[in-house]
Amino acid sequence: MPKYRSATTTHGRNMAGARALWRATGMTDADFGKPIIAVVNSFTQFVPGHVHLRDLGKLVAEQIEAAGGVAKEFNTIAVDDGIAMGHGGMLYSLPSRELIADSVEYMVNAHCADAMVCISNCDKITPGMLMASLRLNIPVIFVSGGPMEAGKTKLSDQIIKLDLVDAMIQGADPKVSDSQSDQVERSACPTCGSCSGMFTANSMNCLTEALGLSQPGNGSLLATHSDRKQLFLNAGKRIVELTKRYYEQNDESALPRNIASKAAFENAMTLDIAMGGSTNTVLHLLAAAQEAEIDFTMSDIDKLSRKVPQLCKVAPSTQKYHMEDVHRAGGVIGILGELDRAGLLNRDVKNVLGLTLPQTLEQYDVMLTQDDAVKNMFRAGPAGIRTTQAFSQDCRWDTLDDDRANGCIRSLEYAYSKDGGLAVLYGNFAENGCIVKTAGVDDSILKFIGPAKVYESQDDAVEAILGGKVVAGDVVVIRYEGPKGGPGMQEMLYPTSFLKSMGLGKACALITDGRFSGGTSGLSIGHVSPEAASGGSIGLIEDGDLIAIDIPNRGIQLQVSDAELAARREAQEARGDKAWTPKNRERQVSFALRAYASLATSADKGAVRDKSKLGG
């Protein structure tokens, strides 16, 4: 039977110094036999998804201590991708994921904590904490800050829903007046919480439910709603139960690697495809699987993408629905219920509540449950009041959205499309694959062919788009923006948003070895692997080359002969030390980012560190 890890620092005469320091934090003799549980918070005033988390760590800690544990809170960093977008700050976003994972490992192992409650929310924070949890493999529960309410404003005598992407598009559209742009900007992000669409943050928080590491409602219950408080209270109580089950009863089912099994990863990816989640989730699930030592690869994702339909459509793929609407329709469990009825899920999985998938659906699926309290929870709705306070309102929808033919969540029979919301494409310059969010691609451009316009930085591409140098029919190629080449694998939300603002959203394609924001829609193909900086063939594309995209058949092809590509590769290699680097890009890259780049793998490996370079 495993002993408490914390006993290393609390027992034995030779640990008198450690105990003296623990006493200085408020611990007493009575605490030294209890489990020490880390409350891993991520409060910051920089990020609306985290601005309300300051007091929530204390809330969890109080429940831990009431249940017989000792709570010790610390914070991780948290980068706001939206604020970092469109300038050099975006180079730091993806690398922050590794820093978060490492910092959690450092704190938890340095102080021998027994378990964790991870309070996350936004883009790289949930993945970073997830990677750390599976690396450490000690009991853990995730509880996120929750989604932002959708913005609303009146334009042309109509009330419309808004989010961050609308503000970006209208701000760049020369046809939009200053007053309208200002109105949209002021209305787009009304409350605390993660941005209101199915962007990366909300996608990842939904996936923690499917992985079994968070409670039902975690991905969709609004940050502002009073019902969300119960998730934090429950997490504090439940983590003590899980911790004692593992350390005192030798019950390994309480460990995250046994909850987030390969079957659970397959369920999470199935959910992601069905709900049209952010393409960034592919990166993060691949990275998390490696930490869990699970053989889960792009090949698995490709297989799932070919059989899973799209059952949910949310902003940015439509402006009709945001996360508050997903919640009203039953949230993540509502989507999982439809997938289960379609025979598309692994049922032999459990969650942190100890429930199997069938038990979870019976209790929490709004189409099955007889529990009025559960139905009431899924009626939790927005208040439409600007606030930075968690749990500040208790508004409810009059009814649930249980219309599986025309509502937000659909049954298999009434799916938005038989193909899911994400697809893996392969071709002669994406030998290891690339990713497209098909949920955001108009049917008219599922097959597309056009001449390449090649740029070696996001900045140059933006300048060309706004300067009118990109025209209908073009395929914009942005390279040397991968994990190693950027470094940092920038998101390309500004180029895709500006294509929309220039009226080219359905008339152009964009291909990159970088990545896209969860707010991206359109024919936007990212994660091209291998990346240019690793000798990938995307580095051989020249202006005017024809590129053919065939999403239905999962293909992407540079229409250049093998002989010509071989000649171009030979010429590239002849550049010596400058081979596979941008020819005309000036970019200041810090030592910290160079250190990240030196170990980074391409996107098909999750952009994690190359362990072979570290002897791993």
UniProtKB/Swiss-Prot annotation:
Co-factor(s): [2Fe-2S] cluster; Mg(2+)
User: Where, in this chain's numbering, is [2Fe-2S] cluster bound?
Assistant: C122, C195
Cross-referenced PROSITE patterns, in alphabetical order?
A: ILVD_EDD_1, ILVD_EDD_2
Q: What is its EC number?
A: 4.2.1.9
* Record PTM N6-carboxylysine, positions in chain: K124
Q: Does the keyword Magnesium apply?
A: yes
User: What Gene Ontology terms describe where this protein resides (cellular component)?
Assistant: cytosol
Q: Which reaction does it catalyse?
A: (2R)-2,3-dihydroxy-3-methylbutanoate = 3-methyl-2-oxobutanoate + H2O; (2R,3R)-2,3-dihydroxy-3-methylpentanoate = (S)-3-methyl-2-oxopentanoate + H2O
The alphabetized UniProt keywords are:
2Fe-2S, Amino-acid biosynthesis, Branched-chain amino acid biosynthesis, Iron, Iron-sulfur, Lyase, Magnesium, Metal-binding
Which BP terms does GO give this entry? isoleucine biosynthetic process; L-valine biosynthetic process
Quote any Pfam family the record assigns: ILVD_EDD_N
Q: What pathway is this protein a component of?
A: Amino-acid biosynthesis; L-isoleucine biosynthesis; L-isoleucine from 2-oxobutanoate: step 3/4; Amino-acid biosynthesis; L-valine biosynthesis; L-valine from pyruvate: step 3/4
Cofactor: record remark: Binds 1 [2Fe-2S] cluster per subunit. This cluster acts as a Lewis acid cofactor.
Indicate whether Amino-acid biosynthesis appears among the record's keywords: yes
NCBIfam families, per database record = ilvD, PRK12448.1
HAMAP family for this protein? IlvD (MF_00012)
Quaternary structure? Homodimer.
Q: Which family does it belong to?
A: Belongs to the IlvD/Edd family.
Cited function: Functions in the biosynthesis of branched-chain amino acids. Catalyzes the dehydration of (2R,3R)-2,3-dihydroxy-3-methylpentanoate (2,3-dihydroxy-3-methylvalerate) into 2-oxo-3-methylpentanoate (2-oxo-3-methylvalerate) and of (2R)-2,3-dihydroxy-3-methylbutanoate (2,3-dihydroxyisovalerate) into 2-oxo-3-methylbutanoate (2-oxoisovalerate), the penultimate precursor to L-isoleucine and L-valine, respectively.
Protein name listed in UniProt:
Dihydroxy-acid dehydratase
Please give the organism.
Shigella dysenteriae serotype 1 (strain Sd197)
Q: Which gene encodes it?
A: ilvD
